[in-house]
Amino acid sequence: MANESTNILYTVKEAAGILKTNVAYVHRLRQSGKLRFIKIGQFKVRKETLENFLKEFEGCDITDPFKVIQL
C-alpha cells in the first residue's frame, strides 16, 4: 500500500507556490514534459513527483524548461 505522501495531490497553483514561481511557468514545465501531471478535472501533480523533480534538476538552470542547462 502506498504511503500517505504519495497520495497528496497539488493543483498547478499549489505547485507554483511550492516552487515559488507562477502558474504559467508550471504549465510550461508540464508542456515540456519535465513535470508530469494527471488531469482530474484540472491538472494535479503528486507530492512525490514534485519532490523527485526538484532532486532531478538540482544544479540545473531550468528557466527555459525546453532548454535545460547544467550549472
What are these language model-derived features?
Residues 18-44:
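Major-groove DNA-recognition helix of helix-turn-helix-type DNA-binding domains
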Residues 2-25:
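Polyanion-binding surface elements
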Residues 50-71:
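A short, Lys/Arg-enriched interface patch at domain edges and termini
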Residues 8, 18, 38-40, 62, ...:
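Weak global preference for isoleucine
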